[in-house]
Amino acid sequence: MTESVARLRGEQLTLGYGKYTVAENLTVEIPDGHFTAIIGPNGCGKSTLLRTLSRLMTPAHGHVWLDGEHIQHYASKEVARRIGLLAQNATTPGDITVQELVARGRYPHQPLFTRWRKEDEEAVTKAMQATGITHLADQSVDTLSGGQRQRAWIAMVLAQETAIMLLDEPTTWLDISHQIDLLELLSELNREKGYTLAAVLHDLNQACRYASHLIALREGKIVAQGAPKEIVTAELIERIYGLRCMIIDDPVAGTPLVVPLGRTAPSTANS
């Protein structure tokens, strides 16, 4: 039997900014039909990897493949029909309303010279309802709080209706209740609609509870990957973060729960 190949994958990637290399010879797959959480300390290459997989950045070496084709061979609009991206610190394009921002998620689906369609309207409405921002539809994005603005950007990605969604720190700026709302929504999209999701998450316990697959990075290298129950150990957390901890079962979800005990001595953390 032939082993299936993930729709989105990178092979032997060298990533960086100018002369600064973040990752070298990195090969990674985003497994189809999974909710993948990318974890690791600050500066380990999580966001850079996500930006490269979405074609927002070009690797210095190596290739990103989407549906069996080199991602650079696709037109930008075609990539946007297949991959939705929530970038970190996204900049609002001018003074527009929340509804106008969310509607931009429909642009990849609109043929040239075609007017706004019923399915576009329905997608925008559903996305705003799912993120709880319907009441903000006519408000300028510039007047929103950080959390409200983040939810508007997430709604735009949802309105794009792509089978693959990449989200860079989607819970940033959100209070705890909206963090859980968002993660529950993403988990539902994955379980019930088969969306392939990859998100950079800093909260390890949220990553373990909601993601079905983890990719753990340290210094631009994949240290471990797999289901949370299979890979999350006290040894792994200490190796990645230099943090001593206990791993217990989450009393609600049964997933690994990280209980911090304190920092490891620098010589141990860097070994």
Swiss-Prot record:
EC number: 7.2.2.17
Domain of life: Bacteria
Compartment(s) of residence: Cell inner membrane
Induction trigger: Controlled in part by the amount of available iron. Induced 1.5-fold by hydroxyurea.
GO molecular function: ATP binding; ATP hydrolysis activity; ferric-enterobactin transmembrane transporter activity
Pfam families in alphabetical order: ABC_tran (PF00005)
Primary site of residence: membrane
The ABC transporter domain, residue ranges: 8-244
One GO CC term, this protein: membrane
SMART domains cross-referenced by the UniProt entry: AAA
Catalytic activity as recorded in UniProt: Fe(III)-enterobactin(out) + ATP + H2O = Fe(III)-enterobactin(in) + ADP + phosphate + H(+)
GO BP terms in the entry: ferric-enterobactin import into cell; iron import into cell
Keywords assigned: ATP-binding, Cell inner membrane, Cell membrane, Ion transport, Iron, Iron transport, Membrane, Nucleotide-binding, Translocase, Transport
List of residues binding ATP: 40-47
Alphabetized Gene3D superfamilies for the sequence: P-loop containing nucleotide triphosphate hydrolases (3.40.50.300)
Membrane topology: Peripheral membrane protein
Subunit structure: The complex is composed of two ATP-binding proteins (FepC), two transmembrane proteins (FepD and FepG) and a solute-binding protein (FepB).
Role: Part of the ABC transporter complex FepBDGC involved in ferric enterobactin uptake. Responsible for energy coupling to the transport system.
Similarity comment: family membership: Belongs to the ABC transporter superfamily.
Name of this chain's protein: Ferric enterobactin transport ATP-binding protein FepC
